[in-house]
């Protein structure tokens, strides 16, 4: 996220009386603290090596919301073209197999720039 997006998030959270910790960080270097977050949201950033740290960073009962492009996105005009940054069928669910799956979807949805092939997961860390 950009610094501007983080500031907007903080302003909205303040107006709603919510406690939000929004961080601008390079995820190549940032170390997620263990059992800290009630909610982790990840959209269109795929770094497979973060799966374990994400699970450990969730508090017991914490939620993960994750969406990323799949290899089927290659047929559309935008999104990553490097297959290393695209999920394979069933991969997202497998990456977070230690969590309780609440919702899982793989397919094509309408995005703001046209169709996009995604895998989506909402999962919960067991108490």
Predicted segments — roles?
Residues 75-91, 111-113:
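Acceptor-substrate binding/catalytic loop of class I
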Residues 107-127:
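Core SAM-dependent methyltransferase catalytic element
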Residues 83-104, 119-120:
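Short alpha-helix
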Residues 61-73:
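Conserved beta-strand signature within the Rossmann-like core of class I S-adenosyl-L-methionine
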Residues 9-10:
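Conserved SAM-binding loop
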Residues 28-39:
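A short acidic, Gly/Pro-enriched loop at the edge of an enzyme's catalytic core
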Residues 2-4:
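Conserved SAM/SAH-binding beta-strand->alpha-helix loop
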Residues 45-59:
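A short, conserved alpha-helix within the catalytic core of class I
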């Amino acid at each position: 996220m950009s610094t501007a997006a983080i500031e907007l998030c903080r302003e909205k959270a303040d107006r709603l009386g919510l406690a939000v910790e929004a961080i601008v960080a390079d995820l190549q270097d940032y170390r997620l603290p263990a059992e800290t977050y009630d909610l982790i949201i990840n959209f269109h950033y795929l770094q497979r090596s973060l799966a374990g740290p994400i699970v450990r960073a969730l508090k017991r009962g914490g939620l993960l919301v994750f969406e990323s492009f799949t290899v089927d996105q290659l047929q559309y005009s935008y999104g990553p073209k490097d297959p290393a940054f695209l999920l394979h069928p069933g991969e997202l669910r497998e990456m977070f197999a230690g969590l309780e799956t609440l919702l899982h979807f793989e397919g094509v949805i309408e995005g703001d720039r046209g169709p996009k092939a995604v895998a989506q997961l909402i999962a919960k860390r067991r108490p």
